[in-house]
Design a protein with these regions (language model features):
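A short small-residue
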Residues: 18, 77-85, 117-121
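Substrate/cofactor-recognition hotspot
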Residues: 108
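Amphipathic, non-membrane alpha-helical segments in soluble helical-bundle scaffolds
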Residues: 1-5, 27-34, 87-95, 128-131
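Charge-rich, low-complexity N-terminal segments
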Residues: 3-30
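Short, helix-capping/interhelical loops that line the mouth of catalytic, cofactor-
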Residues: 2, 46-96
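Short, contiguous alpha-helical
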Residues: 20-69, 113-150
Length: 150
């Protein structure tokens, strides 16, 4: 699977097609998926930075095991949390969110490996698993975008 920087470059290349919609694939436009990906990346990395490693609670979650083993998030199974549902956006805001994501992704290298974030379905994910989730999630939405554009 591609690293986050390569995935972000692919996302950036889709901005010019943000208004494309194919309801047989998704109720949302290409731009909605791009903005959603960026909200997730930016929000999760921000939460990761603010975490307290002493509060980490590891627990086995079957859903995490399946998604992390297969690298696939099934389509249409989960509803996005309100915090990552795109509000109105335009080309400038997408470009600004790409720039923020690039900076935050660079910050991952210096972060404590014990920093974590809490995922609504997968529980607490330490930095390494958080990065893996971001790659899987981004790839999931890029596949949808590419299907919309077919």
């Amino acid at each position: 699977m591609k690293n986050l920087e390569n995935l972000l470059a692919e996302i950036e290349s889709k901005i010019s097609q943000q208004s494309v919609l194919n309801k047989s694939v998704s109720e949302a436009s290409v731009g909605w998926h791009v903005e959603h990906i960026l909200l997730v990346i930016n929000g999760i990395i921000s939460r990761l930075k603010r975490s307290n490693p002493a509060e980490f609670k590891g627990a086995f979650k079957m859903s995490r095991f399946i998604v992390f083993t297969t690298g696939i998030i099934p389509r249409g199974r989960a509803k996005s949390p309100e915090s990552v549902v795109p509000k109105p956006f335009d080309t400038e805001s997408l470009i600004a969110h790409i720039a923020i994501a690039k900076e935050r992704i660079k910050q991952l290298d210096e972060m404590n490996p014990n920093f974590f974030m809490e995922h609504p379905f997968f529980g607490h994910l330490k930095k390494e698993d958080t990065i893996k989730f971001l790659r899987i999630h981004t790839n999931h939405h890029l596949k949808i975008i590419n299907d919309i554009l077919k």
